[in-house]
């Protein structure tokens, strides 16, 4: 690896239908810490982001708001800066997928795919789609609802059932209706464009690319399953990858396909191209040549994403780039989902964290940056923000262990020694500082590997050593006797130098505090290898305050009843409430606590898991559930869930399903991704009825 590297780093593009939430910020902070560390190493980094602005949901939301789609996404973009600045996110550029650069690059990539290999990578096919005659538009699958043709659950989407996990074509839905108008849609034929992901050139490339270290092991293992058997809408099975429908029909807010009037790129084709467009826009503003930059063989390309969009970034995106003759990513770094106190974020229940409210309450952005860093690892794992844990970690680690090192020594140095430090550290002081300096490479390795939790733990262990030195030498006792002046000077000088070293190690996580500390100790905190002893300090200013219980209470205070009522008018969970039922109707559904005895992936399906359940009836049941995107089989074994025990068995192509487990998800999965398997409280036993 060259001593000076050239890196192009991105985060997933947020959909431009609302403000940032904590999940966005977690990803941006994760990437920002890594980027700041790379810059401290002297590497050249271009770190970019953009709004994902296209698609039917944007077009429909804009219409409801009485705006053009362009005005709607511009208004969303105007609200990004307070988040980016407030949480010290060091993006070099924030752009939009509706920008000219993205239109140009998306069309060029398409042309290159179309024109390579005798045009065999792009294929036109006539398909049947549902058309809303009232809206005069073809309906995306997510805007068609009806009865599942397999389990007969009501109000299921047009492509898969969230109750039984079945995958089907929209035309198979029973009694379909348009979610936009409530009208009965009509089946009409339309010519669509397909990228032939099943082409042997795609398959062979992706099998190599996804298994050569570019993905975390657990992600690579998941992707490997997708090259096996796949299920078709007609119930048959075939082997390999499905071709990808990359077009949508007008009216559509997006990028029109070259030489195909009225046809637009599907949003997931042009969205990742937005990474390149944001970079191109940045380089052009600097007077640099984009093509020359991307052609440099030394360039490294990295994407930070959530686990809900792995398919697009590990199959479609690298295949598009490779087969259009472009550089492919060096790594795709996947993270899990975030909960608060073990619950999915919800403003109405007081379990949401509004980032701007956090800042408006005077809460330090770097408290959150540090806390998330302590939880982040290189694995694709979910993480939880516990409010009590948050307060304890910030107050104990950052204030008690770290900042207090400087505050304990600064006053004595300023009052007794005019802020000057001695270079005589004594044997114990030299040994302590040597320990701190000796950890530099280990901490750097943890940062490089995105093991921020391990890096922060290592730093706090060093802080413990410094505080043990304080307790042994007791500078407050030394200060009581003028005869101890030399010893006091020595101890306080060691502490300030230790504080400077710890600050440099924490600088990727706490950039604002590091800048303030830089002014305090007179050392460069932006270079990892900066060294030398601190010569003098400026008068000490408070660097960080403690978190208070009152701040946390205000942050997580649920909205007033009137606000909750207003929010309810916007459809809770993204779906209108179902018609009311009587207690007799509910009593017919037998819900039981079930122990998950075993769980495994289903060959040929990317959505289903096969669960073996015990509800205490003397036998075990097999149930299929469409939760594979959110749950690892090994994590579920031994846990309890809730199942519908009296649902008639139904035969799927993978086997017979003898019930249904309960899971929750938002109506708009793109804006609010995640599937959450329900679990009973502690003490519940298999077979207990849920009433």
Curated annotation (Swiss-Prot):
Q: What does this protein do?
A: Is required not only for elongation of protein synthesis but also for the initiation of all mRNA translation through initiator tRNA(fMet) aminoacylation.
Q: What is this protein called?
A: Methionine--tRNA ligase
Q: Which residues bind Zn(2+)?
A: 148, 151, 161, 164
Q: Which GO terms describe its cellular component?
A: cytosol
Question: Looking at the keywords, is Protein biosynthesis present?
Answer: yes
- Organism, scientific name: Verminephrobacter eiseniae (strain EF01-2)
| Pfam families xrefs | tRNA-synt_1g, tRNA_bind
Its cofactor is: Zn(2+)
Q: Which UniProt keywords apply?
A: Aminoacyl-tRNA synthetase, ATP-binding, Cytoplasm, Ligase, Metal-binding, Nucleotide-binding, Protein biosynthesis, RNA-binding, tRNA-binding, Zinc
User: Which BP terms in the Gene Ontology apply to this protein?
Assistant: methionyl-tRNA aminoacylation
Q: Which family does the record claim for this protein?
A: Belongs to the class-I aminoacyl-tRNA synthetase family. MetG type 1 subfamily.
């Amino acid at each position: 690896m060259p001593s000076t590297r050239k890196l192009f780093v991105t985060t997933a593009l947020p959909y431009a239908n609302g403000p940032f939430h904590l999940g966005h910020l977690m990803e941006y902070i994760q990437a920002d810490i890594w980027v700041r560390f790379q810059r401290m190493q002297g590497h050249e980094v271009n770190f970019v982001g953009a709004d994902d602005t296209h698609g039917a949901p944007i077009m429909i939301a804009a219409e409801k708001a009485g705006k053009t789609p362009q005005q709607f996404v511009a208004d969303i973009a105007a609200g990004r800066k307070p988040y980016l600045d407030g949480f010290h996110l060091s993006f070099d550029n924030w752009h939009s997928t509706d920008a000219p650069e993205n239109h140009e690059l998306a069309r060029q990539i398409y042309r290159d795919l179309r024109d390579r290999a005798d045009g065999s990578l792009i294929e036109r096919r006539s398909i049947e789609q549902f058309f809303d005659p009232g809206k005069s538009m073809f309906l995306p699958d997510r805007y068609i609802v009806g009865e599942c043709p397999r389990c007969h659950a009501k109000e299921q989407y047009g492509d898969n059932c969230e109750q039984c996990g079945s995958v089907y074509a929209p035309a198979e839905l029973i009694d379909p209706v348009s979610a936009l108008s409530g009208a009965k849609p009509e089946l009409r034929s339309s010519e669509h464009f397909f990228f032939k992901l099943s082409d042997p050139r795609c398959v062979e490339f992706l099998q190599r690319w996804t298994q050569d270290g570019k993905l975390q092991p657990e992600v690579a293992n998941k992707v490997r399953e997708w090259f096996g058997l796949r299920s078709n809408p007609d119930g048959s099975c075939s082997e390999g990858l499905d071709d990808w429908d990359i077009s949508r029909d007008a009216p559509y807010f997006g990028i029109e396909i070259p030489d195909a009037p009225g046809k637009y790129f599907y949003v997931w084709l042009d969205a990742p191209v937005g990474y390149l467009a944001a970079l191109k826009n940045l380089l052009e503003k600097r007077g640099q040549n984009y093509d020359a930059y991307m052609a440099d063989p030394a360039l490294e390309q990295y994407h930070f994403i959530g686990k809900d969009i792995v398919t697009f970034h590990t199959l479609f995106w690298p295949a598009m780039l490779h087969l259009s003759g472009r550089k492919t990513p060096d790594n795709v770094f996947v993270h899990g989902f975030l909960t608060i106190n073990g619950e999915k974020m919800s403003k109405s229940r007081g379990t949401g964290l509004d980032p701007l409210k956090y800042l408006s309450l005077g809460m330090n952005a770097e408290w959150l940056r540090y806390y998330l860093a302590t939880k982040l690892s290189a694995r694709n794992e979910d993480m939880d923000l516990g409010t009590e844990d948050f307060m304890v970690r910030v107050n104990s680690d950052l204030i008690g262990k770290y900042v207090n090192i400087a505050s304990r020594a600064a006053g004595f140095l300023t009052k007794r020694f005019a802020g000057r430090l001695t270079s005589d550290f004594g044997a114990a002081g030299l040994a302590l500082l040597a320990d701190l300096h000796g950890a530099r490479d280990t901490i750097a390795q943890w940062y490089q590997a995105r093991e921020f939790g391990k890096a922060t733990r290592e730093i706090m262990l060093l802080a413990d050593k410094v505080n043990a030195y304080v307790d042994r030498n007791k500078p407050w006792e030394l200060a009581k006797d003028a005869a101890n002046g030399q010893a006091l000077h020595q101890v306080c000088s060691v502490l300030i130098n230790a504080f400077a070293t710890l600050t440099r190690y924490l600088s990727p996580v706490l950039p604002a505090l590091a800048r303030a500390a830089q002014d305090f100790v007179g050392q460069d905190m932006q270079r990892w290898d900066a060294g030398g002893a601190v010569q003098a300090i400026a008068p000490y200013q408070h660097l960080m305050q403690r978190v208070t219980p009152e701040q946390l209470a205000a942050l997580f205070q649920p909205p007033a009843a009137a606000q909750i009522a207003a929010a309810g008018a916007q459809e809770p969970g993204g779906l209108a409430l179902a018609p009311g039922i009587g207690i007799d109707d509910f009593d017919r559904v037998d819900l039981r606590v079930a122990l998950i005895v075993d769980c495994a992936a289903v060959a040929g399906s990317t959505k289903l898991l096969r669960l073996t359940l015990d509800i205490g009836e003397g036998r075990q049941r097999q149930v299929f559930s469409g939760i594979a995107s959110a749950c690892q089989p090994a994590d579920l074994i031994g846990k309890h869930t809730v199942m519908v025990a009296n649902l008639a068995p139904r035969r799927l192509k993978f086997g017979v399903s003898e019930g249904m487990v309960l899971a929750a998800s938002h109506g708009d999965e793109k804006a609010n991704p995640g599937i959450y398997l329900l679990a009973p409280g502690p003490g519940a036993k298999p077979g207990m009825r849920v009433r």
